[in-house]
Regions:
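Peptidoglycan cell-wall recognition and remodeling modules
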Residues: 80-166
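Intrinsically disordered, low-complexity
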Residues: 1-98, 160-166
């Protein structure tokens, strides 16, 4: 039974091929007299053509694999539950962000209070500036943008985190 390598492993292999073939192409660019040599010219030109083709194919594979990996990451992030999405977006401010989101929406992505929507109850203007979405991750990322733009404080929100004593 043959094991199929993961897209990440395949990407690593293709990146190694890109580096190798770029090195070969660079060698012939830096040693162009070799391409015109009566003794080695035909073989050098053939090797340069092969490396150029391999390089183009590997670069295409790298682009395709990166697209696949981005799609996998996107699907994984879209499926995150609210707590995990908030912690992914806010990192070291996770605890504070969870407190604010709990107070604002009880961690419900569909929460609505007038014009205020989502986990962090962002208004229409804030959603226009910082984004919004239907998933917990989209909403958490938008709220994090707002948080950073406000100087990394919670002044835009009605609810504030309770800071633990240091």
């Amino acid at each position: 039974m043959q094991i199929t390598p993961t897209p990440a492993a395949r990407l690593k292999r293709q990146l190694a091929i890109v580096r190798k073939e770029q090195s070969v192409v660079r060698f012939f660019r830096d040693h162009s007299p070799l391409l015109r040599s009566p003794e080695h010219g035909a073989a050098a030109r053939a090797e340069l053509r092969r490396s150029t083709r391999r390089l183009a194919a590997a670069q295409k594979n790298v682009a395709d694999l990166r697209r696949v990996l981005r799609a996998q990451t996107s699907r994984r992030l879209e499926a995150l539950p609210p707590k995990a999405a908030i912690c992914d977006a806010f990192d070291r401010f996770c605890g504070q962000a969870l407190q604010v989101a709990w107070c604002e929406s009880r961690l419900q992505t569909t929460a609505q209070n007038g014009q205020y929507l989502g986990l962090f109850q962002m208004g229409a203007y804030a959603r226009e500036l910082y984004g919004h979405g239907s998933t917990a991750h989209d909403q958490a990322v938008a709220a994090h943008r707002y948080f950073v733009a406000s100087g990394r404080d919670w002044s835009p929100w009605s609810c504030k985190p309770v800071r633990e004593a240091s």
